[in-house]
Amino acid sequence: MPLELDLQVASAAPDLPSEAQFRAWCELALRQRPESELTIRLVDEAEGLELNSTYRHKDYATNVLSFLADVPDELLDIPLLGDLVICAPVVAREALEQRKPLQAHWAHLVIHGCLHLLGYDHIDDAEAEEMETLERELLAELGHPDPYACDDEEPPSKEK
């Protein structure tokens, strides 16, 4: 069974990636678990703020939130992985501020969120290095630049 992707566009925004692009990015990030079911929900800043406040106790809309399906496999008939919530206006603003190609930033955040669902994290430096290295490798396969490279004096802001 291939990847089952439920794409929910709760907030329309200009220049959103296609469902095929979201699927390709997820399949790339989830190669080690190709039989997965996940939802990607695209939200506005109000919903992004509400979710980030409720689940992370942060008072701002963040770029991507990941929610792992915490259900024992034996209780499911499907390989449910979890949900990603991506705030489209934040993605667009970050790409502009960080002078990154918009589609490359979308790809990065989808891959980043999928890796969280697989158990990767960036809480400590060693975990962050492992996760960021994998992100760089996967994005390079797509022909996208290193998302952590910085052309100016100020490093790009990185939201967790």
From Swiss-Prot:
Location in or out of the cell: Cytoplasm
Cofactor annotation remark: Binds 1 zinc ion.
GO CC list: cytoplasm
Pfam family, one: YbeY
The entry's keywords: Cytoplasm, Endonuclease, Hydrolase, Metal-binding, Nuclease, Ribosome biogenesis, rRNA processing, Zinc
Binding residue positions for Zn(2+): H112, H116, H122
Signal sequence coordinates: none
Main function: Single strand-specific metallo-endoribonuclease involved in late-stage 70S ribosome quality control and in maturation of the 3' terminus of the 16S rRNA.
Similarity field: Belongs to the endoribonuclease YbeY family.
Organism lineage string: Bacteria, Pseudomonadati, Pseudomonadota, Gammaproteobacteria, Pseudomonadales
Chief location: cytoplasm
EC number: 3.1.-.-
Cofactor(s) named in the record: Zn(2+)
UniProt name for this protein: Endoribonuclease YbeY
